[in-house]
C-alpha cells in the first residue's frame, strides 16, 4: 500500500485589508513549489486579509515564512487601525493537518517556521494552540492580550509576556507573529438586523465559550458597513455545529471567511441559505483542493 500524500493547510491572517497591491504582493510571496493557493479575501473594516494555501509540509512552511517576511516589509503597525485585534503585520499563522499528517507534526512545522521567521526577518513569534510552549499560551486571545500597542511594552517589562522565539521586544513596525497548529475551524460572520454594535457585543459575549456560552466558540461584536456583526470562530464544528450557533443568533445575513470543510457544510440548512455568495466549488476545502486558484502574476 502506498503512503498517503501529506497535505497541510495554512491560513495566515495579515493586518492589511485596504491596500490590494500590498495584499497581492504578500500572496505572490507564497508561490512556492508544492503549494496551491485556495482562497484569499480582504476586509476593509477589519483591515485584515486571510489567505488559504495547502500543499506539502515543507512547501507550506516555506510559503508561510516568506509571507511573514513580505508582510513585515510592507505593513507598518504603528499607523495601522482596524476592528480586528492584532499583534503583528502577519498576525496569526496556523498550520492545519488535512491528510497523511498529524496535528503534532503540524505543531513541529509551526515551531520550525517561527524559528526561521526570526532568523530571516527578526520578527519574533509566539506559539499557540497545539504548538504552545506552555498552557497559558494555548489560547490565541491570551497571546494577543493588549494587542500590538500593549504587547510591545509588556514584552519588554514582563518576562512572562516575552516571545517564544526572538525578542525580548517586538519588531518595531511588524510586531510579532502568533504561529500555531490547530484543527479545522469555521470562520463565520453573522450580520444582525441592527446598526447598534453594543447589541453585537452582547450577543458575542453570550455565545462564546469563555462567557459560559457554546463549546469551542470564540466571538466578538463589531460594526461593518453600518451593520452590527458577530464575528465568530467555531473551533470544534463537530461539538458545536454551525447550525446551533446560527440558532442562537437572529441573523440578517451571514458569510464564511476562507474555506469550510465538507463535513461542516449542510446545504439544505437554514443557516446555509443565509450565506451570501456561497459557491461550493470555491468555498469547500475538499472541492477547492481539486481546482486551486492561479497564483497572481
Predicted regions located by residue number:
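Long, contiguous binding/interaction regions
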Residues: 2-297
Amino acid at each position: 500500500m502506498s503512503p498517503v500524500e501529506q497535505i497541510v493547510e495554512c491560513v495566515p491572517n495579515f493586518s492589511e485589508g485596504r491596500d490590494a497591491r500590498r495584499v497581492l504582493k504578500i500572496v505572490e510571496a507564497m508561490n512556492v513549489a508544492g503549494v496551491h493557493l485556495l482562497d484569499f479575501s480582504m476586509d476593509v473594516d477589519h483591515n485584515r486579509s486571510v489567505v488559504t494555501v495547502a500543499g506539502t509540509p515543507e512547501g507550506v512552511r516555506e510559503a508561510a515564512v516568506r509571507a511573514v517576511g513580505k508582510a513585515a516589509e510592507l505593513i507598518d503597525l504603528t499607523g495601522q487601525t482596524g476592528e480586528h485585534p492584532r499583534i503583528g503585520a502577519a498576525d496569526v499563522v496556523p498550520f492545519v493537518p488535512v491528510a497523511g499528517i498529524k496535528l503534532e507534526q503540524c505543531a513541529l512545522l509551526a515551531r520550525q517556521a517561527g524559528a526561521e521567521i526570526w532568523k530571516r526577518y527578526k520578527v519574533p513569534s509566539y506559539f499557540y494552540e497545539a504548538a504552545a510552549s506552555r498552557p497559558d499560551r494555548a489560547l490565541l486571545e491570551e497571546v494577543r492580550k493588549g494587542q500590538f500597542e500593549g504587547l510591545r511594552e509588556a514584552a519588554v517589562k514582563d518576562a512572562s509576556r516575552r516571545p517564544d522565539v526572538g525578542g525580548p521586544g517586538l519588531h518595531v513596525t511588524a510586531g510579532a507573529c502568533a504561529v500555531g497548529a490547530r484543527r479545522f475551524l469555521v470562520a463565520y460572520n453573522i450580520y444582525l438586523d441592527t446598526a447598534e454594535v453594543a447589541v453585537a457585543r452582547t450577543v458575542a459575549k453570550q455565545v462564546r465559550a469563555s462567557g459560559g456560552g457554546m463549546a469551542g466558540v470564540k466571538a466578538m461584536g463589531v460594526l461593518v458597513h453600518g451593520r452590527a456583526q458577530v464575528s465568530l470562530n467555531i473551533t470544534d464544528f463537530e461539538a458545536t455545529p454551525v447550525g446551533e450557533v446560527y440558532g442562537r443568533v437572529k441573523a440578517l445575513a451571514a458569510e464564511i471567511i476562507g474555506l469550510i470543510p465538507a463535513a461542516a457544510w449542510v446545504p439544505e440548512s437554514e443557516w446555509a441559505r443565509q450565506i451570501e455568495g456561497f459557491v461550493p466549488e470555491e468555498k469547500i476545502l475538499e472541492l477547492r483542493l481539486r481546482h486551486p486558484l492561479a497564483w497572481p502574476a
